[in-house]
Each structure stands twice: as structure tokens, then as C-alpha cells.
Amino acid sequence: MANGAEDVVFCRGTGQSDDSDIWDDTALIKAYDKAVASFKNALKGEDGATPQENDNPGKKRKNNKKNKSRKRCNAAPDKEWQVGDSCYAFWSEDGNLYTATITSVDQEKGTCVVFYTDYGNEEEQNLSDLLTEPPDMDEDALKTANVKETESSTEESDRSFTPQKSGHAKHKSKSNFPMGPPSWFPSFPPGPPPPPPHFKKMDGRRGEGPGPSFPGWPPMIPLGPPMIPPPPPMSPDFGEDDEALGSMLISWYMSGYHTGYYMGLRQGRKEAAASKKSHRK
């Protein structure tokens, strides 16, 4: 170690390291510049095509106006429109064709008031502008009309289905409810019969239990033991040994209480079984 202390292990910047080409990111920079240049060229191409696209809507609008004028020229001039007739009219705000119904006609002025069926609006139209059928309806207007017809048909079907559905619901509700209390809980037996006239009360010791047991029925199981009487009080002057002794006595007391309660339950069941056998005899 002392002899090689002055030897040079690595010198930064000499380029003699085997992994010196790792820090050469020239290819990465060229790829990035190429991608940015292609993206800019694409943006320039879109900007050059934008004015042409902006010119197209104007031409389309002119074509739409020409088509609308042609449609209006296609209207039948000899038709005598009357109140209640169905027709197609162009709405003044958007210029689209919609289904309408004539509500009033003014033959002197050559105008009428139409009620747009799908939207509920009213507007005054010239009788010459009304159409009996849409000859060359625009795609957007045709889609709108189809959507409205579909919605109206679905609403009618829903209305027609509603009473039937309610009838089925009523039928189901009637069938789901039981006819009487016995069918609510089929797994439980019915209530006990009234006691016979010759039934005698239990003695005082048994009367303190959960309740009388009827003949032919098993004894009723109590819900739980009554309140446990409090343990005897302890003096606060007890030491550690006295505390341990007191804890032991309390545990014996509680154990004896629960043991007596359990034995009492067993004795009560035996007496109930014996009385049941005697009644059968």
C-alpha cells in the first residue's frame, strides 16, 4: 500500500477511460433537433392550409343558400294550404328545414303561421316557402328529424308501458305480502294454547324462575342470569397480600354464584321433564 500511494488511478478529462463515450450525447441532440424541425414544418403546413379551409365554409354557405333557394322554388305554388295541414318550413334563425303544422292562414297577404312540431315554436311564413315533403334535405336536418322522431316514439312506448308496469308491480306487491301472521315465520311454532282450568301454579321456588311451563311444551329458557349481587366490600387498608387474598375471595364468590345458577337451571329442567312425564301418564 505504501509503495503504490503515488500511482494515478483515474484522471478526469484525459479521455483515457473506457466509458468516456457514455457522455457523448451528440446523436441524441441531432435526433431531438430533427424531431423539432419536422414538427415545425408540420405546423407550417397546417397554417398554410388553414386559409383554404376558411374559404371553404363561405363557399359551402353560398351553396347552401343556393340549395335552399332551389328547395323553395320546388314548392308547389298551386297547393291551397289550410289550417291543420302538415308541412316543412325553414326556420328563420338557423335556416334549417323542420316539420310544422299550419295554425292560421292569411290568403290576402300570402302568409301563414306555422307551429314547429318538434320544438313548439311558432313563426310566420310565406305560403310559397312551405314544402309538402323534403326533396333534398340536408344531412344535419335529416339527422335532427330522425332523432326527434325516435324520441317521440320512445316516449309513446314508455307511456304505453307505464300502466302495464304499474299493474305488474301491484300484482307483485299483492303476491309478496303474506295472507296472515302464521305464514310470516314458517319455522316458528304458533303461540302456546291457553292454560287448562285445572292447571296449578308452581310453588314459590319455581315461581321465581323464568315463568310457568305449560303441559306439552318444553320449559322456557331464560334470557340470562339476573343481576349479580355486589361482592362484599373491602377495606382500603389492605396490603399487597391482602389485595391478592381479596381478589381470590372475589373470584371464588363469583365462581360459586355462576355454579349455583347453572345447577339451578339443570334442576329446573329435570323437574320440568318429570312433570311432563307425569302429565302424560
Swiss-Prot record:
Subcellular location: Nucleus, Gem; Nucleus, Cajal body; Cytoplasm; Cytoplasmic granule
Domain Tudor intervals: 80-140
The entry's keywords: Cell projection, Cytoplasm, mRNA processing, mRNA splicing, Neurogenesis, Nucleus, Phosphoprotein, RNA-binding, Spliceosome
Gene3D superfamilies: 2.30.30.140, Periplasmic binding protein-like II
Predominant cellular place of this UniProt entry's protein: nucleus
Example of a GO biological process term: synaptic assembly at neuromuscular junction
Keyword Acetylation attached: no
Region (Disordered): 1-20, 42-77, 145-242
InterPro entries in the record: Smn1 (IPR040424), SMN_C (IPR047313), SMN_G2-BD (IPR049481), SMN_Tudor (IPR010304), Tudor (IPR002999), Tudor_SMN_eumet (IPR047298)
Sequence positions bearing Phosphoserine: S17, S20
CC terms in the record's Gene Ontology section: Cajal body; cytoplasm; cytoplasmic ribonucleoprotein granule; Gemini of Cajal bodies; neuron projection; nucleoplasm; nucleus; perikaryon
Modified residues (Phosphothreonine): T14
Domain notes: The Tudor domain mediates association with dimethylarginines, which are common in snRNP proteins.
Complexes and interactors: Homodimer. Component of an import snRNP complex composed of kpnb1, rnut1, smn1 and znf259. Part of the core SMN complex that contains smn1, gemin2/sip1, ddx20/gemin3, gemin4, gemin5, gemin6, gemin7, gemin8 and strap/unrip. Interacts with ddx20, fbl, nola1, rnut1, syncrip and with several spliceosomal snRNP core Sm proteins, including snrpb, snrpd1, snrpd2, snrpd3, snrpe and ilf3. Interacts with elavl4.
Entry similarity comment: Belongs to the SMN family.
Protein name: Survival motor neuron protein 1
Protein source organism: Danio rerio
